[in-house]
Amino acid sequence: MQDVEEFRAQVRGWLADNLAGEFAALKGLGGPGREHEAFEERRAWNQRLAAAGLTCLGWPEEHGGRGLSTAHRVAFYEEYARADAPDKVNHFGEELLGPTLIAFGTPQQQRRFLPRIRDVTELWCQGYSEPGAGSDLASVATTAELDGDQWVINGQKVWTSLAHLSQWCFVLARTEKGSQRHAGLSYLLVPLDQPGVQIRPIVQITGTAEFNEVFFDDARTDADLVVGAPGDGWRVAMATLTFERGVSTLGQQIVYARELSNLVELARRTAAADDPLIRERLTRAWTGLRAMRSYALATMEGPAVEQPGQDNVSKLLWANWHRNLGELAMDVIGKPGMTMPDGEFDEWQRLYLFTRADTIYGGSNEIQRNIIAERVLGLPREAKG
């Protein structure tokens, strides 16, 4: 396997050579709340990364990946952030569904989908949350019934990121009549370009519309496009969520580090850094980011079997940190941040508005704390009613 520092130098050189010309204007684009920015141009950039073998770094070589270590992948994310490269467009495919198919998919599913994920020719979205099943995902009500050699799907998903730009969706649906909670769920791969699927973008407080409602009205997918066994969807879905931690989480933190660095520069430029309270909060933000990095590295380098509560602690750490950063940004800007939309501070106003949801989506803080309390600390269940 290639030496990590040699690989780092290779990535740095490739980015310097390729993030130029037509792609130079993409620097810094994309990211949370900004997925719409130059989407097709970023997709073309993502395809150039794939052609250079700089996607799917952790996938096994037999599945089209590089089979690289955690240290190599960390080095890639660090160099990618240092180059201010644009956010990639196929996170759900490369980081979530791909590893899930490698772990649970049939050989036919792997041959059908993994090359198209790797080459960024098919984009995916995640069909988990519903109007009545957000943080409490086990309350999923979307149904799928077998009709000959196809599943017939009915129901609604919500807060589905980038569904309007995706070709496929991995959907958690109830396939056993009368089942409740975690039982009777299946993990289906569903094409979105069909008459039975309607996608409605949701305009957010930021004015953008990355999230969507997705309606399934007798939508269909082939019977063999269930990942894992029918009825075992909860286990597969939870495995998918674990792939969001580790290197993927660390990559997210590197983006956060770039945001913090830009905010420090803004504080210097506006003289907000002269305020000792602002300086203290910037320092606390830096130490919090280092703590998250240490935690992410510890979980990646720890036991192969995931320890209970790791994902929940990670979610609490980054959600609170990023929301606090949005609040700090508004305090650095001061009054102009409240009265001058679409101006010099637009980027920071948008960050503040978007981060209000960080402690809600992906499992609210309250749900995360309940899980830690009940499943890790062994405390009594929360009283209901």
Curated annotation (Swiss-Prot):
Q: In which pathway does it act?
A: Steroid metabolism; cholesterol degradation
Keyword annotations for this protein, in alphabetical order, are: Cholesterol metabolism, FAD, Flavoprotein, Lipid metabolism, Oxidoreductase, Steroid metabolism, Sterol metabolism
Task: Report disulfide bridges, numbered on this chain.
Answer: none
Q: Which residues form the active site?
A: E244 (proton acceptor)
Checking Gene3D superfamilies in the record gives:
Acyl-CoA dehydrogenase/oxidase, N-terminal domain, Butyryl-CoA Dehydrogenase, subunit A, domain 2, Butyryl-CoA Dehydrogenase, subunit A, domain 3
GO BP: cholesterol catabolic process
Instruction: Output one GO MF annotation.
Output: oxidoreductase activity, acting on the CH-CH group of donors
Its EC number is: 1.3.99.-
Q: How the cofactor binds, per note?
A: Binds 2 FAD per heterotetramer.
Q: Known InterPro entries for this protein?
A: Acyl-CoA_Oxase/DH_mid-dom (IPR006091), Acyl-CoA_Oxase/DH_mid-dom_sf (IPR046373), AcylCo_DH-like_C (IPR036250), AcylCo_DH/oxidase_C (IPR009075), AcylCoA_DH/ox_N (IPR013786), AcylCoA_DH/ox_N_sf (IPR037069), AcylCoA_DH/oxidase_NM_dom_sf (IPR009100), Mycobact_Acyl-CoA_DH (IPR052161)
Q: Supply the PANTHER family for this chain.
A: ACYL-COA DEHYDROGENASE, ACYL-COA DEHYDROGENASE FADE29
Q: Which family does it belong to?
A: Belongs to the acyl-CoA dehydrogenase family.
Q: Its biological function?
A: Involved in cholesterol degradation. Catalyzes the dehydrogenation of 5OH-HIP-CoA to 5OH-HIPE-CoA. Can also use octanoyl-CoA and dihydroferuloyl-CoA, with lower efficiency. Cannot use 3-oxo-4-pregnene-20-carboxyl-CoA (3-OPC-CoA).
Protein name per Swiss-Prot or TrEMBL: Acyl-CoA dehydrogenase IpdE1
Give the originating organism: Mycobacterium tuberculosis (strain ATCC 25618 / H37Rv)
Could you tell me the gene encoding this protein? Answer: ipdE1
